[in-house]
Swiss-Prot record:
Residues 26-249 are mitochondrial intermembrane. Component of a prohibitin multimeric complex in mitochondrial membranes. It is found in: Mitochondrion inner membrane. GO terms for cellular component: mitochondrial inner membrane; mitochondrion. The chain crosses the membrane at residues 9-25. Prohibitin probably acts as a holdase/unfoldase for the stabilization of newly synthesized mitochondrial proteins. This is Prohibitin-5, mitochondrial. The gene is PHB5.
Amino acid sequence: MPWSKFTKVALGLGAAIAAVRSTMFTVDGGQRAVMFHRFEGILEEPVGEGTHRKIPWVQKPYIFDIRTKPYKINTDSGTKDLQMVNLTLRVMFRPDVVKAVVAQFNADELLTERPQVSALIRETLIKRAKEFNIVLDDVSITGLSYGKEFSLAVERKQVAQQEAERSKFVVAKADQERRAAVIRAEGESEAARVISKATAGAGMGLIKLRRVEAAREVAITLSNSPNVVYLPSGGNMLFAMNGPSKVVA
């Protein structure tokens, strides 16, 4: 029984510590935090160094490194007495401008509006560099990558969009085929109706006319092909009015 009480006390103490830790976060030296509020969006005022409180689930801090970073550049140059010298320059910079601009766009916009993001970064950096008599020729984003989970989500979204477009194409094709079948059936029905009406009006005269036209075609074929023999199935050797016939080469 004492051991059970000790376990309960330990679990309760651990839960209390976890609850307290979930309401606090720490910003180290050389860092700043941007607070995202689930209902209000990104708060304008950045959070400085130290330990701060947050509302679990409602607030989430994003911590950025603002320390000055070195960047080395190797270049060749000529001296006054025409001697070539190789120089290694160290440029100290802070990525404040890049982070400030990127924070204005969401992840999808960075992909679709990359030229606009580059232009905004370039404009801001050129304006800032002029204060120190530095001329920047160009600034552009040459690489952009996300975390594995977001990349997989983007890939799944693209696959879903492709499947949706494919489904639309299949549905449209089926609809066109259905319409074509309806039009073809309507045409055949209309043709049958016209033939039936003509036959009813002309009687056997129309049928005899068709037979005469068929016999004329056979005669033309025989005249153009002396090696072809016409073999009627019935007793009429000229027009084969009373039965089927065939042409044998």
